[in-house]
From Swiss-Prot:
Its EC number is 2.4.2.18. Mg(2+) 1 binds at residues 103, 236. It comes from Arthrobacter sp. (strain FB24). 5-phospho-alpha-D-ribose 1-diphosphate binds at residues 91, 94-95, 99, 101-104, 119-127, 131. Anthranilate 1 binds at residues 91, 122. Mg(2+) 2 binds at residues 235-236. This is Anthranilate phosphoribosyltransferase. It comes from the Bacteria. Its cofactor is Mg(2+).
Amino acid sequence: MTSQASAQAAGNTWPRLISALINGADLTADNTEWAMDTIMSGEATPSQIAGFLVALRSKGETVDEIAGLVEAMLAHANPVDIAGEKLDIVGTGGDQLNTVNISTMAALVCAGAGAKVVKHGNRASSSSSGSADVLEALGVRLDLPIERVARNAEEAGITFCFAQVFHPSFRHTAVPRRELAIPTAFNFLGPLTNPARVQASAVGVANERMAPLVAGVLAKRGSRGLVFRGSDGLDELTTTGPSTVWEIRNGEVTEQTFDPQALGIRAATVEELRGGDATANAAVVRDVLSGVAGPARDAVLLNAAAGLVAFDVDAEGTLTDRMAAALKRAEESIDSGAAAAVLEKWVALTRG
């Protein structure tokens, strides 16, 4: 029996689900898991996918609805087995601010500080340089067999799960997403569907309404970490002003405002964080890892500190206290050369 046939026997059909959404009813996680499984299996038409996404967005997604999408997407992913505690630092994109690759640099700094980082990302969609683009410009090969992706995490302390390699079934969404050309729930699934199933996440979300939902899904799935949104709309912890932070610990989500000036970080402007294409942004990565001071370094240190706070399950104290301690570790990672050494070893492993 196909997934369509078995689901119809259980009452799940596209007309039923889309009609419910149009009428303002929330779906269950089982409903959306069926929908995503059908999409990932190639059994949904572009019209059904588009209708579902638009109806879901118009009603407004819930934690359970997103959780169902995530469950099905992970079920269709190519798994990668990486032992131990793992961290992902990632932004959803979509802030339209075209900054340098802050989360990618922060990931390298966290690895230099001893965290095992499994970054999940893709090429740019709304900016000039996504994580995959800048890593390629730095010399990291992305077209690796899955076993080598896992080995890099063990030997270099960091690896990259290229979304299009690990989520091949997501190709079925390409046409309706391209033709809709609007943000949908699918724009927020990347940080929630790391195929290594990381235990800790530091996630930047530009969309103000979706940020607490992303935190809620992480909590529902038993993850820990931080979700944040800059007051300037940046999908990072911003240095231009305060950020809203949702912390996930022990299945609970707490919301607070975090001001980087409390850590002595100088206020920057968005223009000072502006990036370019992959080549230009790769040059910024090399500068930051070599110890060049300035707004880019400050933003990287702040977001690396967030990653280390997410990773360190045993740390105590207020968020500001834990961020201050983690900031010192991030500074040491750069200033000792450890972060740069991680990148050098990673490039060599992917090229060997």
